[in-house]
Amino acid sequence: MKLLHLTTALYLAATTGIASAQDPNLARNLAASCANCHGTNGNAVVGSGMAPLAGVDKGRLLQAIKDFKSGAKPATIMHQIAKGYSDEQMDLIASFFAVQK
């Protein structure tokens, strides 16, 4: 499972930079990989123990992702996944979840 997340993150990081200016669905597509743990559109399954992402303040979520990436915030898998995203991609993901309900 960890390898799948890491592979997905690295693939997206390698291929989406070129497409970012052309794909209006890029934020949604990047955020889709988060559904594996955090639920569809960031609506975590009740009782799963996973934090919901839908409606979380963009700045707060962006800082959390950056903290996972830098290692400042401990995690089991997020520190690996976050390393696969550029700053621009993390901003898109945080923006996407901030407007979800």
Q: Which role does the model predict for each range below?
A:
Residues 2-9:
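Sec-dependent signal peptide recognition
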Residues 14-16:
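N-terminal signal peptide c-region/cleavage motif recognized by signal peptidases
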Residues 25-31:
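Local sequence-structure signature of Cys/Sec-based thiol-disulfide redox active-site neighborhoods
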Residues 27, 42-69, 79, 83:
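Gly/Gly-Pro-rich "capping" loops immediately C-terminal to redox-active cysteine motifs
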Residues 32-40, 93:
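The canonical Cys-X-X-Cys-His
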Residues 38-44, 98-99:
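Detector for the c-type heme attachment site
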Residues 70-73, 82-101:
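C-terminal capping alpha-helices of c-type cytochrome domains
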